Regions:
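Conserved helicase motor
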Residues: 285-288, 309-317, 333-338
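Hydrophobic positions in the central parallel beta-sheet of the AAA+
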Residues: 283, 329-331, 353
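Cofactor-binding loop segments of dinucleotide-utilizing enzymes, especially the Rossmann-like FAD-
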Residues: 134-136, 285-287, 416-418
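Extracellular/periplasmic catalytic domains that process cell-envelope and extracellular macromolecules
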Residues: 86, 322-325, 406-409
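ATP-dependent helicase/translocase motor core
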Residues: 1-280, 289-305, 334, 343, ...
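Conserved motor-coupling elements within RecA-like helicase/translocase cores
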Residues: 314-329, 345
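Signature of the SF2 helicase/ATPase Hel1-core->accessory helical subdomain module
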Residues: 101-105, 143-144, 151-153, 337-447
Length: 447
C-alpha cells in the first residue's frame, strides 16, 4: 500500500493477471508473483513434513471455491457449468451432463469444441490446467482449447467405469480428484508444461528450421492411480517390497516414471519426520544412451535445482552421486557392473530403484551386478557369462540366489514392463493365490 496507495488491490490484480497471461497459471501458483521487489505467494501447498508450523497454518488458509453457471464473456451470456478456483484464481473448468436429460460426456465435448471461444481470456492456453466433460458414465479431459481441433482424452478407471452402488459411475472424480489436497497435489507435483523442439522443412526458406511447441501435461486417471497406490503401499509396508507396473504402449510410461521418481524422493513416513523414507532414487533405463524422453520428463518436473542428476560422464560420476546422497539419479543399466563395490559400501541407506522395461533389463550379467550392488551383503560370486549363449544359465542363477536370499529390507524395486515374462513376474510381481501378478495393470485395450 505504501507504493500503490488506495489503488493497491487493482494494481496487484492486474499484475497477477499479466503474469498468468505470460507465464501460465501453473508457474504463477508455484512460484508466486514478483512486483517492485516483493514476492506474493498465491497458494500454499501441503507441507511434505510438519516441522514448519507457519507453513502448516498458511496451508490451512487456502480458499477453494466452486462456482456454478460461471459467465465468462463480455460478448454473450454463455456460462460454464462449473469453475474451480484457488484463492480467487481459476484452475479447472467443467461441463456437467446428465443422462436423465438425454445428454452425456459427448455433448460436453461438443460444447467445448464449438461453443467456447478459445480466444476468450479465461480459455487461453495455460490459463487453466484442465477442461473436463463429465457425464454420468464417463469423463473426458483436455488441456488446450482450439476449436474443432481440441483433443480430448479419457479420464476413466478403465475402458468403462465400474458400476457405483452409491451413485454415478463418475463419482470418483469428485471423491478422488476434486478434493482440496488432491487439487493442490496436482498443481504442485503433476501438471507441467512440456517444451518440444522439432526440425521441420520451411518451403519459404527452403531449409530445415526449428519449431518450438508447448503442451500442458495433465495426468490420466491410471497414472494418478498407480502413483497413489504405490505411495500408500510404501507407507503401510515400508521399504523392501518389489512392484511390477504393467503399463503397455500408449500409457504415458515416461511420465509415470517421472512422477513416481519425484514422489518417492520426497516421501516421509510421518509428517513430523525429518528424514525421508528413501535416501536416493535411481532411475535405470535399458539403453546405452540415456532415454531422452524419460530424462527430459524427470528434469522438466524438477522444481528445485540439483534434485535430478543424470549420469552423463564416467562411472566415477555415478559413484560420486551415490556417495554424496543425491536425491534422484538417472543412469543406464550398463553402468552398474563397474560400481558394485562402491554401492555395497552404502548398504545402510535406503534406495528406490525404478527400472524401465524390466523384462529385458533383468536378463544377463548386468542384473547380477545390479542386485549385488544394492544389497547389504553381496550375492555369492560366480562365473559371469561371457557371451549371449551363457545368459540363460546366468538368469537361472540370479533368480535362485535372489529367491534364497529373500527380499532386501533397504531396497524397493519398481519395474515397468508392458509385456512381462514369467521370471519378471516372479521377481517383481505381487504374490497371490493364482501366482504372481502385477501390482498395477494398464492394458493395450485401455490405451
Amino acid at each position: 500500500t505504501e507504493q500503490y496507495g488506495d489503488d493497491t488491490n487493482n494494481k496487484l490484480t492486474k499484475r497477477i493477471s499479466e503474469q498468468i497471461e505470460s507465464k501460465g497459471v501453473i508457474e504463477v501458483l508455484r512460484k508466486g508473483v514478483k512486483d517492485r521487489g516483493n514476492t506474493f505467494k498465491l497458494v500454499y501447498f501441503k507441507p511434505k513434513s510438519g516441522l514448519n508450523q507457519e507453513h502448516q497454518d498458511l496451508y490451512k488458509k487456502n480458499r477453494f471455491i466452486e462456482l456454478r453457471q460461471l459467465k465468462y464473456s463480455k460478448k454473450n451470456e454463455n456460462s460454464i457449468d462449473m469453475g474451480i478456483f484457488i484463492n480467487g484464481i481459476p484452475v479447472m473448468m467443467l461441463e456437467l451432463k446428465n443422462s436423465l436429460t438425454g445428454q452425456d460426456h459427448t455433448h460436453g465435448i461438443k460444447q467445448w469444441k464449438f461453443d467456447r471461444d478459445s480466444k476468450e481470456p479465461l480459455f487461453k492456453f495455460k490459463r487453466n490446467i484442465v477442461y473436463f466433460s463429465v457425464g454420468n458414465e464417463k469423463v473426458f479431459m483436455s488441456t488446450r482449447l482450439s476449436g474443432p481441433k481440441t483433443r480430448f482424452l479419457p479420464f476413466n478407471k478403465g475402458i468403462d467405469n465400474p458400476v457405483n452402488p452409491k451413485g454415478h459411475m463418475t463419482h470418483y472424480l469428485w471423491d478422488e480428484l476434486l478434493q482440496k489436497d488432491s487439487v493442490l497435489d496436482l498443481i504442485e507435483n503433476f501438471v507441467h508444461i512440456r517444451k518440444d523442439v522439432e526440425k521441420v522443412y520451411d518451403p519459404k526458406q527452403q531449409r530445415l528450421v526449428e519449431k518450438k511447441s508447448e503442451t500442458l501435461i495433465f495426468p490420466r486417471y491410471h497414472q494418478l492411480n498407480v502413483i497413489g497406490k504405490i505411495k500408500q503401499d510404501i507407507l503401510d509396508k515400508g521399504t523392501g517390497v518389489n512392484y511390477l507396473i504393467q503399463h503397455t504402449t500408449g500409457s504415458g510410461k515416461s511420465l509415470s516414471i517421472g512422477w513416481l521418481s519425484h514422489m518417492l524422493s520426497s516421501l516421509y513416513q510421518n509428517p513430523t519426520d525429518s528424514n525421508r523414507i528413501f535416501d536416493t532414487i535411481i532411475v535405470v533405463t535399458d539403453r546405452r544412451v540415456l532415454d531422452k524422453q524419460i530424462r527430459g520428463t524427470i528434469l522438466q518436473l524438477e522444481q528445485t535445482k540439483g534434485v535430478v542428476n543424470p549420469v552423463e560422464g564416467t562411472s566415477q560420476q555415478l559413484r560420486e552421486f551415490l556417495e554424496s546422497g543425491k536425491s534422484i539419479i538417472i543412469t543406464t543399466i550398463q553402468k552398474f557392473p563397474v560400481i558394485s563395490e562402491t554401492i555395497s559400501k552404502l548398504g545402510d541407506r535406503k534406495f528406490g530403484v525404478i527400472i524401465d522395461e524390466v523384462h529385458s533389463s533383468q536378463s544377463g550379467e548386468t542384473s547380477k551386478h545390479l542386485k549385488k550392488s544394492l544389497s547389504k551383503s553381496n550375492l555369492d560370486d560366480y562365473q559371469e557369462g561371457e557371451n549371449e549363449d551363457d545368459l540363460t544359465q546366468v538368469d537361472k542363477m540370479i533368480l535362485d540366489e535372489i529367491n534364497s536370499r529373500g527380499k532386501q529390507p533397504h531396497i524397493s524395486y519398481f519395474g515397468f514392463s508392458g509385456t512381462p515374462k514369467n521370471k519378471t513376474l516372479e521377481l517383481f510381481g505381487t504374490p497371490s493365490e493364482e501366482g504372481f501378478k502385477p501390482f498395477d495393470l494398464y492394458s493395450m485395450k485401455q490405451s
